[in-house]
């Protein structure tokens, strides 16, 4: 990563500037227009802070199948956090950084998990980026302040190490309690996304252990119903067991600092549903199961 010199952001009185320039032009002369600066904002990242960013604190990669709309959403979300600088003592909000997941911002309709099922929704796939960032933050020794698991385990990260988000409802956030600022850098390619968290060598952990301490099964149930319009008995909803998972984060630094955190995930079981075409068929099945 290379850095170039920063420049302040200036907001001018546009109406006054145009009026002054119009006056000069209407007179058929040349001259200088008076410019009133309404607002000035200094760069978020100073040259001094940029020079302190000299090492990768932690990074993580997740992979995904090629799907045009979902890929596009992942790309947009990854780009939206690229270049974010979080000063010491400040916090990062994923929802704030990525903004509204809307068509106006380029997001497309793609599958999202709702109550354990895939349903179409604008911005499907952004959770892959928040999950990737969560794991990079864990490995960097950062303090996670907001994180929630999905309704069901996902396939692109170990169980208990996912981070779902929902605009205005569920956020992923971390607090920078390190000595120096951290800089987020994302690398998107079709089929994978990598997030690097860069910082100062003084803040690079000397030891990181992310372990799964518990992975208990929560059995699902099988329910039945009758639908006379069906031509055959069949399993209409494929359920799965739930999980209760505990993941711990243990971090050490060379100067003696330590950090420990625990993350609890409860994935609800989803019932299996078998639909019979008649009550007698259901009873026959139940009798067979008992024998």
Give residue ranges: language-model regions.
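Well-ordered beta-sheet/strand-loop patches within structured domains
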Residues: 1-291
């Amino acid at each position: 990563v290379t850095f170039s010199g920063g420049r302040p952001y200036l907001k001018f009185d546009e109406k006054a500037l145009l009026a002054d320039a119009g006056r000069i032009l209407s007179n058929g002369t040349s001259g200088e227009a008076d410019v009133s600066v309404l607002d000035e904002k200094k760069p978020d990242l100073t040259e001094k802070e940029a020079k302190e960013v000299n090492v990768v604190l932690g990074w993580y990669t997740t992979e995904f199948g090629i799907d045009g709309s979902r890929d596009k959403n992942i790309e947009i979300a990854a780009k939206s956090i690229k270049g974010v600088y979080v000063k010491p003592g400040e916090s990062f909000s994923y929802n704030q950084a990525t903004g509204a997941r809307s068509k106006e911002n380029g997001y497309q309709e793609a599958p999202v998990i709702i109550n354990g099922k895939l349903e179409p929704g604008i911005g499907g796939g952004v959770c892959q980026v928040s999950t990737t960032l969560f794991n990079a933050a864990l490995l960097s020794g950062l303090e996670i302040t907001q994180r929630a698991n999905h309704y069901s385990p996902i396939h692109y990260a170990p169980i208990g190490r996912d981070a779902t988000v929902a605009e205005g409802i569920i956020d992923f956030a971390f607090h920078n309690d390190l000595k120096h600022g951290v800089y987020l850098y994302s690398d998107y390619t079709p089929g994978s996304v990598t997030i690097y968290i860069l910082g100062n060598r003084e803040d690079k952990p000397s030891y990181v252990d992310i372990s799964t301490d518990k992975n208990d099964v929560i059995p699902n149930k099988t329910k039945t119903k009758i639908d006379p319009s069906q031509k055959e008995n069949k399993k209409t909803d494929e359920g799965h067991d739930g999980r209760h998972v505990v993941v711990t984060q243990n971090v050490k630094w060379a100067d003696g600092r330590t950090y420990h955190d625990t993350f609890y995930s409860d994935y609800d079981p989803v019932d299996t549903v078998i639909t019979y075409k008649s009550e007698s068929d259901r009873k026959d099945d139940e009798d067979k199961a008992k024998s």
